[in-house]
Amino acid sequence: MCRTALEAGQPLRDLTMPPEDLRRLRGFQFLSSKPLLIVLNLDEADLPQADKAVELAGIQSFLTGPNTRAVPICAKIELEIAQLDPADASAFMADLGLKESGLDRVIRASYDLLGYISFFTVGEDENRAWSIPRGTNAQNAAGEIHSDIQRGFIRAEVCRYEHLLARGTLAALRDHAELRLEGKEYIVLDGDVINFRHAT
């Protein structure tokens, strides 16, 4: 199947293969089996038509499979955003009609292509994002932090990132009964804020 596709000029990323075949192919490191992210650098004047950038660039043929993405950005504007403080950057993006920076879109597309999500832990002295494969359960997510937390896993207190922003603290969420208790088989979602209860 792979040989036929390669001889026909079809990238391996476009093939649908069973997991055991994918494992066998891993050792060969075929470049065409890797996810493809195309970042298009647009002129400022073309930003309002960013949704048509793929068509205008004539790269539709590269974006036929599920493992390909194109993200249009304007590098000049991204440089300006990077040099501003967060409040000014938000106002600047709002003036341009941008909901998020190009860098954020590239990161999101990369995570999506690689099959990763992020969850957050919030503490007194540290807030942190953790990257895990999509479909990871709560106990294995706890193992990303420390193997002792995974072994002693009892429950996970879970809320959405947006809810934490609205209430301000986990204590406020607890007071309003907005923290859910989930077991070890709970599938962690992108943007979950989790406090792991564990035995020491």
Give the ranges of each region predicted by the language model:
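C-terminal-of-GTPase-core extension/linker across diverse P-loop GTPases
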Residues: 1-189, 194-200
